[in-house]
Amino acid sequence: MFKLRIYKLSGAYKGNLDHEEFFSTREEMETRYNELFVYENYSLNPTAWENVGGQWKRLEEF
């Protein structure tokens, strides 16, 4: 299982977690990540995670 953590892009809570989206395959997650990614947003872009052994591990290449 994979997930994207989506962050608020503006307002008083800018940079805080907005919501998470879950995916059964890495390919689905990558497709959605590419839809959301904006180079100019830098650290506000989504972060990608994989569930390994019941714990979430961040995927560094995203």
Where are these regions (language model features)?
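Short aromatic-glycine-(Arg/Gly/Cys) micro-motifs in beta-strand/loop hairpins
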Residues: 1-17
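Positively charged, low-complexity intrinsically disordered regions
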Residues: 6, 20, 27, 58-59
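A short, charged, amphipathic alpha-helix used as a generic interaction element across diverse proteins
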Residues: 11-14, 22-45
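Low-complexity, intrinsically disordered short peptide segments enriched in small/polar/basic residues
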Residues: 3-6, 26, 35, 49
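Short, mixed-charge low-complexity intrinsically disordered segments
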Residues: 35-62
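Residue-level detector of beta-propeller blades
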Residues: 13, 17-19, 51, 58
